[in-house]
Amino acid sequence: MTKADIIESVYEKVGFSKKEAAEIVEMVFDTIKETLERGEKIKISGFGNFIVRDKKSRVGRNPQTGEEIEISARRVLTFRPSQVLKNALNGGVSDETEGADDDDDDEEGEGDE
């Protein structure tokens, strides 16, 4: 699905003009982008969490030459889906505890691969 598809869906479902639907979708994406640029977490109930993480610089290895190289510090974006979304993707079936907290703040291990 593309941004144009999302705009079309908003247009069809809400009844705004295509121009209004496009402006609303653009505003939502701009707000999300600006929030993430500030390093803030975005929590969307029933959907998931977007989290910006700072990764430290580290020494890596060139797989072709074996030479050690420095990998610079950077920010990475991770997404953690809510239990509601996970259940929806699995047809309402979950292998995790039913009724798990949707706003789980235990973020250990996310984006650290």
Swiss-Prot record:
GO terms for biological process: DNA recombination; positive regulation of metabolic process; regulation of DNA-templated transcription; regulation of translation. Residues 95-113 have a biased composition (Acidic residues). CDD domains: IHF_A. Keywords: DNA recombination, DNA-binding, Transcription, Transcription regulation, Translation regulation. InterPro entries: Hist_DNA-bd, Histone-like_DNA-bd_CS, IHF-like_DNA-bd_dom_sf, IHF_alpha. It comes from the Bacteria. GO terms for cellular component: cytosol. Disulfide bonds: none annotated. Coiled coil: none annotated. Residues 88-113 are annotated as: Disordered. SUPFAM superfamilies: IHF-like DNA-binding proteins. GO terms for molecular function: DNA binding; structural constituent of chromatin. This protein is one of the two subunits of integration host factor, a specific DNA-binding protein that functions in genetic recombination as well as in transcriptional and translational control. NCBIfam families: himA, PRK00285.1. Heterodimer of an alpha and a beta chain. Belongs to the bacterial histone-like protein family. HAMAP family: IHF_alpha. This is Integration host factor subunit alpha. It comes from Anaeromyxobacter dehalogenans (strain 2CP-C).
